[in-house]
Amino acid sequence: MKYLATFYTHFDATKYHKYIRKKGAMASLKPVPRKLSSSCGSCVVFTMAGELPLEELLTADVERLYQVDGDDYLLLGENE
């Protein structure tokens, strides 16, 4: 499954990128798509081979977490 996470700061994005890769994801740092708004403009796009609970994907560093389906983004959760 493919996911996209947005962040409040670039530091949070970098930290999450390392975290999610340690969990076994194929991940990359990218600019946030225009369809979505983000505080820092950076996002992490990642694919998980297995399933992780939402609590492990939506850490405190994440602003919003989306499931990616082509050009569509389904909001799975957010931190305020």
What is the predicted role of each segment?
Residues T9-D12, T47-E51:
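Helix N-cap motif at beta-to-alpha junctions
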Residues M48-E80:
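C-terminal structural segments of small proteins and small subunits
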Residues M1, H10, R21, M26-V44:
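Amphipathic, hydrophobic secondary-structure cores in small proteins
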Residues L4-T6:
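A short beta-strand micro-motif
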Residues K2, F11-T14, G41, D61, ...:
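Alpha-helical structural elements
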Residues H10, T14, L74-G77:
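NTP/phosphate- and nucleic-acid-binding module
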